[in-house]
């Protein structure tokens, strides 16, 4: 066990690659010239999908489909630890994640892209840390700012350069899912300060921090949250699918711009 830990740490010494974690609506990157794919075995089981290695604009990029390539894994069953460990183990030092959210803030509209700066965690029943007492000394990582400021700056610059509307800042409330929320639950989240609600933001962000990986997320508003606006009485899954299909064009364009700017 000790020798495997040493080898693992050696692999983690040099991290330079950029990874994209695709969520609902983003199961592939059309501009990624895939060189090879690899199913990585981890101490935490198998990741959600094979890692796709390739290049975008001459830059090495890895892609992972959070819900599997057929979108078969619900948010509460995603193996977040395996996903993050696999990426780190293969040389990833920066992760840009994409996730769909419900808009709580009145200004948010379906199709908006938001770059959250804070989060609230309401999830339960998930493996939330690598420091589980099995073979690693516990480290209490600082999580004051859950998203990488440097990566957020690159995302904002990329959006400006590409003429892509991107809202700067927001508070992501992570819930367990897979069901959507009640109107009363959204009322509570709003009182707590949340501006959007999603199901995959945690423990993904915290695990990235534990591994020393820069992490930021692009949140795609796919509907107004329960009890709000067009979702006052019910949420239309057909409408969500339509929004995702349209919004992903902008997401892909933004990713291409970010790839050109991340060191």
What does each model-identified segment do?
Residues 112-117, 214-217, 233-236:
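Short, hinge-like loop/turn segments at secondary-structure boundaries
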Residues 60, 93-94, 165, 195, ...:
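Residue-level detector of anion-binding/catalytic polar loops
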Residues 226-263:
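His/Asp/Glu-rich mid-to-C-terminal helical/loop segments that flank catalytic regions of hydrolases
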Residues 145-191:
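Active-site rim beta-loop-alpha module in soluble metabolic enzymes
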Residues 12-144:
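Metabolite-binding pocket within alpha/beta catalytic cores that recognizes anionic/polar moieties
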